[in-house]
């Protein structure tokens, strides 16, 4: 493993551990989250252990791990010398590390159905959407480590909105999605090509599917197509796809 890859994974692990420790202090114990099988259209199978009680909604989270491993093993490409390639590898591997962490965290939420795991799942979603913003800023303004720290720090702090209002997380997530799409459109206009534009369009469509399918989980269950593989399951598929297309979009800009 390259030193910058190890550094990227260490930074992701450190930030994740700090989030876990913060959640377990109880500071977010009054945050409104959905806990319980009744919030999912997939019927739990009582004969299975808790971590597989909703088998499809549980196992789909392995896709994040596979995605993270795939991109962690992929080669980073960037114009310029070794320094530029090291920076491109760090950017890519932080994002891959986030995918590696996010899959197990979501599985914990599905399997345990506790308030702390639900909070952790919500909280870690925000810096994942913030990383493409930081990546785009790096492509546009050059390598500025303090900028990464500022973007991710602001993203993590934005979860405090969940303490102020029952829908504070949804507001924070909406702002993150808008910022990520806005930065991607801006960087596409300045540095993109047809290929990167295609990846961006597919990523935005996947993001739309991720949001709509999750919100309509119970409504879609009225249709036979969504009774076994529910809206929540397909929203996770769309989430993995938007992750993948974000990788393709951002890494393609390094070679434009």
UniProtKB/Swiss-Prot annotation:
It is a multi-pass membrane protein. Pfam families: TMEM187. GO terms for cellular component: membrane; transport vesicle. Its main location: membrane. Keywords: Membrane, Transmembrane, Transmembrane helix. The chain crosses the membrane at residues 8-28, 51-71, 94-112, 119-139, 146-168, 193-213, 233-253. The keyword Cell wall biogenesis/degradation does not apply. It is found in: Membrane. It comes from the Eukaryota. This is Transmembrane protein 187. The gene is TMEM187.
């Amino acid at each position: 493993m390259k030193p910058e890859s190890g550094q990227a994974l260490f930074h992701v692990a450190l930030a994740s551990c700090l989030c876990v420790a913060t959640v377990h202090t109880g500071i977010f114990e009054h945050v409104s989250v959905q806990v319980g099988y009744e919030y999912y259209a997939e019927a739990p199978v009582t004969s299975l252990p808790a971590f597989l009680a909703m088998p499809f909604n549980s196992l789909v989270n392995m896709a994040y791990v596979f995605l993270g491993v795939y991109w962690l093993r992929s080669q980073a490409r960037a114009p310029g010398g070794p320094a530029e390639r090291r920076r491109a590898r760090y950017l890519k591997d932080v994002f891959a590390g986030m995918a590696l962490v996010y899959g197990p965290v979501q599985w914990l939420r599905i399997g345990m159905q506790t308030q702390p795991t639900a909070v952790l799942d919500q909280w870690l979603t925000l810096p994942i959407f913030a990383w493409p913003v930081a990546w785009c800023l790096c492509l546009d303004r050059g390598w500025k480590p303090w900028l990464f720290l500022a973007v991710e720090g602001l993203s993590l702090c934005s979860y405090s909105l969940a303490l102020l209002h029952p829908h504070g997380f949804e507001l924070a997530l909406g702002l993150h999605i808008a910022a990520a799409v806005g930065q991607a459109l801006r960087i596409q206009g300045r540095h993109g090509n047809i290929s990167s534009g295609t990846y961006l369009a597919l990523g935005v469509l996947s993001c739309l599917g991720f949001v709509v399918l999750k919100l309509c989980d119970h409504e879609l269950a009225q249709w036979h197509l969504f009774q076994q593989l529910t809206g929540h399951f397909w929203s996770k598929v769309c989430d993995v796809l938007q992750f993948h297309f974000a990788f393709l979009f951002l890494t393609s800009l390094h070679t434009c």
